[in-house]
Amino acid sequence: MTYAILIIVSLLLISDRISNVVDKYCSENPLDCNEHCLKTKNQIGICHGANGNEKCSCMES
């Protein structure tokens, strides 16, 4: 049980770091989000959020 909790916490921390890396694509240059999604998932990248530049999401075209 303890191992399961440690694995879940580790995965949550890793996914949080990944999302923070993706978020920087929109804050620096919105075109970076699109390039990131094209290279990693062959999808279109779209920046969104309260200010329009807080989160990068990949979507199928």
Swiss-Prot record:
Organism in which the protein naturally occurs: Olivierus martensii (Manchurian scorpion)
Range of residues in the leader sequence: 1-19
Disulphide-bonded residues: 26-47, 33-56, 37-58
Coiled coil: none
Source superkingdom: Eukaryota
Propeptide: 20-22
Keywords: Antibiotic, Antimicrobial, Defensin, Disulfide bond, Secreted, Signal
Tissues in which the UniProt entry reports expression: Expressed by the venom gland.
Function of the protein: Antibacterial protein.
Keyword hit for Phosphoprotein: no
GO CC annotations on file: extracellular region
Protein family per UniProt: Belongs to the invertebrate defensin family.
Compartment annotation: Secreted
One GO BP: defense response to bacterium
Designated name of the protein: Defensin-like peptide TXKs2
